[in-house]
């Protein structure tokens, strides 16, 4: 049986990929356990997007941080088999990605950064289409799975409405739902909480927390608190290079004894230092400054957050 699948996105548009499900039917029940990235590189003409990157991750939620242009999306597109690396390889349970493309595609849930839908379809119609393309041929089972993921993302009461009537946040939740359809063992989320309000962002965190024991989840986001609350391990990329791998606590330690809280009385007090955060308490403004030594006699050292550790790391390598 050959099915034409056009649910994968490339350059913000849909394109068709042909999967031969008969070739991987038995393997579709296999679970991806380990992903190893070995000396991965990719160039767009003369621009190096990834430069000799190596790391590994397994079941659980693995965080991917980095500023714009760091190479995060390029890596995720390579892992999703949408892009071939210029050098190096990715091993899926010890086997080269280039030889496992069909298996990966039948076991992946992918939410790209720029997710598009068919606006004339309802959420149920769109997800039914995706489910069929992912090989769910039993109509009853398909409907049950669709309603399950719609409840997970809190769209079940809007399931019969056309997607064109949805807000941007609701469309993003449709994107999360389509990634979850088919019970994939590898999930790739590129900026999944963009456009979500705080309640829905918390709901997303709960979703991936529930499934993280069974699946490999790669989470890339600029919302550092999402990484802090969901991940144990992470990697930081900058200008295509790996600049950090370790635990969330390890990255926090980069800023240990380097973040100071001072009351803001004049702008000159903070002008010579990197300001990580401004907060208000009892009508008084306080600044969190990054400094290797105590900047003022009245400065107080505070415990760093992940965002503080991340900013301190980027400042070190600037």
Task: Describe the residue ranges of each PLM region.
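Catalytic Walker B motif of ABC-type/P-loop ATPase nucleotide-binding domains
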Residues: 187-191, 196
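Walker A (P-loop) phosphate-binding loop of ABC-type ATPase nucleotide-binding domains
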Residues: 67-71
